[in-house]
Amino acid sequence: MLSKKAYNQVQRYVLEHSRLGIPVMMSSECPHGHQALDGYLLPVNLLAGATFDPAMVRAAYRVSGRQLQNMGVDFALMSMLDVLRDPRWGRSEECYSEDPYLSARMAEAAVIGMQESGPEVVAKHFAAQGEGTGGVNASAARIGERELREIHFPPAAAAIKAGAKGIMAAYNEIDGVYCHANRWLLNDVIRKEMGFDGIVMSDGVAIDQLDSMTGDNVVSGALALQSGVDVGLWDEAFGKLEEAVRRGLVKEAQIDQAVLRVLTLKFERGLFEHPYLEEEGEIHMDYAQNPESVQLAREGLVILQNKNQVLPFWENQASGKKIAVVGPNADDLYNQLGDYTPPLRRDDGITVLDGMKLIFKESDIRFLQGCYLRKRDENLLKEAVEVCSHPAGY
């Protein structure tokens, strides 16, 4: 209930203290389910793609959408446009696949599922963010138009055809032009070719990052607006568009066009007529009563047969053999669930180590951290090597 009360407090303050009394439109991160406390989480996109089952993705997002709708979220910011081209990329899990056709079908399903429950979708990121140089996040995509059209445009076209109301521009540049400054990409391609009529949203502070090219934050805001960006995210540049008009960098009509797109969506959402939420009603989505997410996770797994006892598991637990579970993620629930995951309670899931203890005798299991994720510690590594080299001794 606190989220609904907070929503109404924000809405009331804006309506009562702003000059025109225009209601706010709330957005929330939803790359694989709702990134909020007690949010209904889905498996990461890479696993969802491994199901090859768009209907299951659609069903899971329908549940997630119900929760978002009940919490007053108007826009779900959803990862679905990135096609994985380099597995070194740290955000690989946000991609459904390395295949543009499969990625497009999953994007389509995600949009339909979410919007069936009420919230609109901002599909991200456009375009070619999965093509970064050397797998470095937000680095340049060194490709041409053929690769764009064959590999990176299909998911966006599918999301737009499915009814996505928003597109988020990507951080990267393509052939030397930043996506947030690429009018061909944000106007000619998605609006004229794909028929998109919603809003184009910037990624976080991406407009301000154009300063590295323009050297002037006011110019950066004007450039992004002229290139087709309608809504900024955390940046300062769009707050300076009035100065950009005074300096002749943009015309008021260009700002009016962006404002019109935003106001149109607010009217379509009914926010002017019904700006507040009913504060009663359930917003927690129990996984037992809503098993779609768990089913999606199960269908994305590949079960391997342990032929010839290649893996050190045995049916006879009285054999006296031991199991070493090594690695910093083996007993860390949060690290199992991918990026864009909210803080969790310890009893919200089972770690790899927990699962091993459910099957085998706890006395037969030895957990070794092995290393830290963000710093080097030779002692932890030496301990793990020693135990695994002489298993009979522990």
Question: Positions of the model-derived regions?
Answer:
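Glycoside hydrolase catalytic-domain context in secreted enzymes
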Residues: 1-394
